[in-house]
Amino acid sequence: DPLRDQFTLVYKLPEEKIKDRPAPISYSFIDRNNNIWLCNEETLYLYNTHTLQTLQIKNEIGEDITDIEQIDDTHFFIGTEQGIHHAELKNQGLHLLPCDKLDNLPIQINELYFHRPSRKLFIGTFERGIYVYDMNTKQSTQPNMSLTDVSITRIKPLNNKELLVATDGAGVYKI
């Protein structure tokens, strides 16, 4: 018997919740707690791959999610088409945490990358370049780069000290 891929359905969104939606999921994410997040503007479905249980929670942000970056077991940064939010997942709910330097940054988020050693969040935007939020100083800055009118599509580590930043047509940059 030759090797072949085999797919088994392990979770299906509730039909009554998605029947009138042309795109029932705007974003999906797998966290370090074995949860697969299936997100839309109204609801977050967290399917745990170990317990096989699903938690449905209200999307307290009320916006389409574009990216999620996990900080620790319970804290996340969540990017949307309108901005970025700091949240905590606890007591079977998503709780927004105040963060004035990010809450007042009304930009479309394309990509998030959290650099754990420095505790800095790199924020890739749509046509506004890249921002850096330092969790130690609680400050948000924009690096002195010529990326201020560029869309950032991906941020990935090159090594322990450098990141690669991919853009939508303007090349790949190293920070």
Descriptions of predicted regions:
Residues 1-175:
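Carboxylate-rich, polar loop motifs that coordinate divalent cations or form catalytic acidic clusters
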